[in-house]
Amino acid sequence: MQNGDIITGVDRFPPANTGTQEITVNFPEPMRGAPKVFAMWEDTTITLTYVDKLVITGATSSGFKIATNRLKPSENWWFCYIAIYNR
């Protein structure tokens, strides 16, 4: 793999009211092109009782948008991601 082919990271949804929330995640360095992005909750004990799945939209070389339907307010929900650019 060359530089710009894979980026991994951790980010969080800030505390908010219940309901759908979307944030933009910026990569620490640009990728070569629009990557495939995969994400999962950092805490594997989180179940759908508390939060819904992660939905990724708008992946570009500089970052992506990610949304979730958070059912529990006033907590930080951490997730990890991997972005892979395959030419």
Positions of predicted regions on the chain:
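Extracellular receptor-binding modules and their adjoining Ser/Thr/Gly/Asp/Asn-rich linkers
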Residues: 1-36, 42-45, 56-87
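Short, surface-exposed beta-strand/strand-loop-strand elements in extracellular ectodomains
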Residues: 51-53
